Amino acid sequence: MLSLHCCNILQRYCFMTEFESKHGQVSTPPYQLYMSFTDMRNFVSMLPADRRNDVQADFDTITASIQGFNIGVKVHERVPYSRIELVDWGAPLAFHIVLYFDPGSGDNAYGTDFHIKVEAELNLMMKMMLGGKVKDALDKIVDTLVDASHGKMPEGFDPSQFDPSRFGGGSGV
């Protein structure tokens, strides 16, 4: 899908650019992992306490102030235990995010094949500046989720600030 729009600031053409993460084998069943992501308030629970003040969330939306920019995400569609689609909501650029919760296979038959796809409206300069960083960030999210499903927490993560009951019965991710 390629759309052509005039950017309001730079007056240059923007194109829908697609980024896709690698696939990660999460050791949690799709239904359980999916339920962790359905409520946007769960994302606030994962933040350190000192960062939560800049983030507001309800079931369908989450907004934050990041380096002076307000950015928001809204759930566009939920397909139970399969995917969640998010769209920009008050963000300075148009984007669409899809989180996939596919059934695992082989050694991970009871787990989830998790991956993320992002489409963002970027001009050529922004695409060149951000392209690799977006892909790296998506891959890091997948790796962190896979590691967490195997009991390895990210560096600097303080479990005492995490409320696992928000993620379906206290079992964590």
Q: Language-model segments: what does each one mean?
A:
Residues 4, 8-56, 172-173:
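Hydrophobic ligand-binding cavity/cleft-lining segments
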Residues 17-23, 61, 70, 96, ...:
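Intrinsic-disorder/low-complexity, polar/charged segments enriched in Ser/Thr/Lys/Arg/Asp/Glu/Gln
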Residues 23-27, 74, 100:
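Generic structural detector for well-ordered beta-strands
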Residues 33-37, 43, 62, 75, ...:
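Hydrophobic pocket/interface hotspot
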Residues 44-45, 53-92, 171-172:
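Glycine-rich portal/gate segments that line the openings of hydrophobic small-molecule binding cavities
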Residues 146-173:
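Short, highly charged C-terminal tails/helix-capping segments
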